[in-house]
Regions:
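N-terminal membrane topogenic signal
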Residues: 1-12, 240-255
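"…centered on the first transmembrane helix and the immediately adjacent amphipathic helix/loop
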Residues: 16-31, 38-42, 46-108, 112, ...
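Interfacial helix-loop-helix junctions of multi-pass membrane proteins
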Residues: 28-32, 80-84, 98, 142-143, ...
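Membrane-interfacial alpha-helical segments at the cytosolic side of multi-pass membrane proteins
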Residues: 41-50, 105-121, 155-157, 179-195, ...
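Hydrophobic alpha-helical membrane-insertion segments
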Residues: 61-70, 133-147, 304-313, 376-390
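Internal alpha-helical transmembrane segments of multi-pass membrane proteins
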Residues: 122-139, 365-381
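Membrane-interface capping segments at transmembrane-helix boundaries
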Residues: 193-204, 435-445
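Intrinsic disorder/low-complexity segments
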Residues: 202-244
Length: 446
């Protein structure tokens, strides 16, 4: 059995010592326990997977640094961390920003180990996607952490909401935390890109591609063709996606139907300004799909799923999400406390777009099919988190006087967390469906 290096042993000893000292008389024992639950799970996971993962020295130092920062924050509670209070007074800030610093450190310090794991195990290759996917995973995890925080807050201190979490009066606390993690991860990936770590500093990735990574790359390399001719052959490898079965004119017909539907709902929307803002997503999506069509063509099934989601979103934009008739019908029939059409759309975002995202990652990024499925979940969770950030920015620009109320939260202080949770649940449901269908198909063939 390979023994841990002196560096690893030293890092473990330092982290353990800091944790033990911080565990003595924390400022708030209940908050300390809650803050340390995820830390203990995280440390346990690293310990159990050490022999398999064996991070590089750079990644190990990054992980240890984050553990120490979080341990100190948990001891004082993030809201009352002395260093943050000093910075608040010295720079004349509106609040203690140690929590923002910790979220930024989360992105900055953990994105490198995540990238290392992806390069070694997932089959993806060095390049733009090897930088984008780790950032997406960081943002997805940050969003999931905000979801978990909201659940814990409602269980431990129902009714106190973000005040119990140390939001310090910031109604955009969750979005600002996610921005901090995103900026931190982008900074680290920018540093890695500038230093060209993959070529100029090979010692940062001392281990060769793992057997699992070679298998993943082999399974993902089936989808290398991205040109029109190669894409046609590749689409045959995805179930129910052969254009000849559905009709070679499927895409033009689907586009024509959607355009007609969009034009009909563009006439006299309930709120024209809200309609314009909601349609920015549609405009951006259509432009991206149009310009990338010749380089990467999705299967007909993927295009169908994309069109269905855009149609659902178009309905929400016409009525504004808080006033969609179907949502009122669900509210009355199921005796709900609000119009939940927005939750349906967020769930649909994850459920319907999981397959297209998986197809993109497997065929274009060369991720293994299993890795592609779960990386697609992370990518969609990241997009959902990013959308909540964009919404917050737009609300503060367009109607700063209304704040979160402008977004149609309908009085729900956890609206952002529930939207992200719905998208994540939809993506996981779709991923499980794909895994089960593939397993059933394999058993039937066998």
């Amino acid at each position: 059995m390979k023994q841990p290096s002196k560096l690893i042993a030293g890092l473990v000893a330092v982290c353990a010592a800091v944790w033990i000292i911080a565990a003595i008389h924390p400022l708030d024992r209940q908050a300390w326990v809650l803050e340390n639950i995820l830390l203990v799970v995280f440390a346990g996971g690293l310990a159990l997977t050490y022999r398999r993962l064996q991070f590089s020295n750079t990644s190990s130092v990054s992980l240890a640094a984050f553990v120490i920062l979080h341990t100190i924050g948990a001891h004082y509670t993030y809201e009352k961390m002395p260093l943050g209070i000093w910075a608040r007074d010295f720079f004349h800030l509106s609040r203690n920003h140690y929590d923002r610093f910790a979220h930024g450190a989360f992105g900055f310090l953990l994105v490198f180990p995540i990238r290392e794991l992806l390069l070694r195990f997932s089959g993806i290759r060095r390049g733009a996607w090897s930088f984008a996917l780790p950032v997406a995973i960081v943002l997805a995890v940050s969003g999931c952490f905000e979801i978990i925080e909201s659940i814990v807050a409602e269980i431990v201190a129902p009714g106190k909401g973000v005040q119990w979490l140390g939001g310090q009066g910031d109604e955009w606390d969750a979005q600002n935390d996610m921005v901090s993690a995103l900026v931190g991860s982008l900074l680290m990936m920018g540093v890695v890109a500038m230093l060209k770590c993959t070529e100029a500093r090979p010692h940062l990735h001392p281990l060769p591609l793992s057997p699992a990574g070679r298998d993943a790359r082999a399974s993902g390399s089936e989808g290398r063709g991205v040109g029109l001719g190669e894409a046609s052959a590749e689409r045959n490898k995805f179930p129910h996606s052969n254009a000849r079965d559905i009709g070679k004119h499927f895409l033009p017909i689907a586009v024509a139907c959607y355009v007609a539907f969009w034009i009909a709902l563009a006439i006299h929307p309930l709120d024209r300004s809200d309609w314009l803002l909601e349609n920015l997503l549609i405009f951006i999506s259509v432009i991206v799909l149009a310009f990338s069509y010749r380089k990467f063509r999705f299967s007909n099934l993927s295009y169908a799923l994309i069109v269905v989601f855009l149609a659902f979103h178009t309905i929400g934009a016409h009525y504004t999400y808080a006033k969609v008739p179907a949502g009122f019908w669900m509210q009355d029939w199921l005796h709900l406390n609000r119009n939940h059409y927005d939750r349906v759309i967020h769930f649909s975002f994850g459920f319907l777009l999981l397959y297209p995202m998986r197809e993109l990652l497997v065929r274009s990024v060369h991720a293994g099919k299993q890795w592609g499925t779960w990386l697609a979940v992370a990518a969609l969770a990241a997009l959902s988190s990013f959308f909540e950030i964009i919404e917050a920015v737009v609300a503060q620009i367009v109607r700063p006087d209304l704040g979160a109320a402008y977004l149609g939260t309908q009085g729900d202080i956890w609206d952002a967390q529930k939207d992200m949770g719905a998208a994540f649940a939809g993506a996981v449901t779709s991923a499980l469906a794909i895994v089960l269908l593939k397993r059933a198909s394999a058993e039937a063939v066998g």
